[in-house]
From Swiss-Prot:
Signal peptide coordinates: none
Primary localization: cytoplasm
Modification comment: Covalently binds the prosthetic group of malonate decarboxylase.
Organism: Pseudomonas putida (strain W619)
Name used for this protein in its record: Malonate decarboxylase acyl carrier protein
GO cellular component terms, semicolon-separated: cytoplasm
Classification via HAMAP family: Malonate_deCO2ase_dsu (MF_00710)
One of the record's GO molecular function terms: acyl carrier activity
Highest taxon, organism lineage: Bacteria
């Protein structure tokens, strides 16, 4: 198991909390809750050791060049593909936009 942390610039805190996915379905669970203004924080707990560069590239592509709400994101991963990660994050942001 490996724990990775990432931080990106963000706007105002998001509204509400959400949980999307589950580790046994798609191998990924994403929890989101409001964060501190100006900061999007991500913690990934993954069963895939040595995958930090892959996660960093995925987040760079997703979070750069666009303004996101300030949230804290906890990701529990059991070998999900980048496509599943992106899908779950997009679902999470969609959910908090409706709270």
């Amino acid at each position: 198991m490996e724990t990775l942390t990432f931080q990106f610039p963000a706007a105002e805190p998001g509204r509400g909390r959400t949980l999307v996915g589950c580790v046994s379905s798609g191998d990924l669970e994403v929890l989101m809750e409001p964060g501190t203004a100006g900061s999007l924080n991500i913690q990934v707990v993954t069963s895939v050791n040595g995958s930090g560069a892959r996660w960093e590239q995925l987040f760079q592509r997703l979070f750069q060049g666009r303004t996101w709400p300030a949230v804290n994101i906890d990701i529990h991963d059991f070998g999900a593909t980048p496509g599943v990660v992106r899908l779950r994050l997009e679902q999470g942001f969609e959910e908090i936009a409706h709270d």
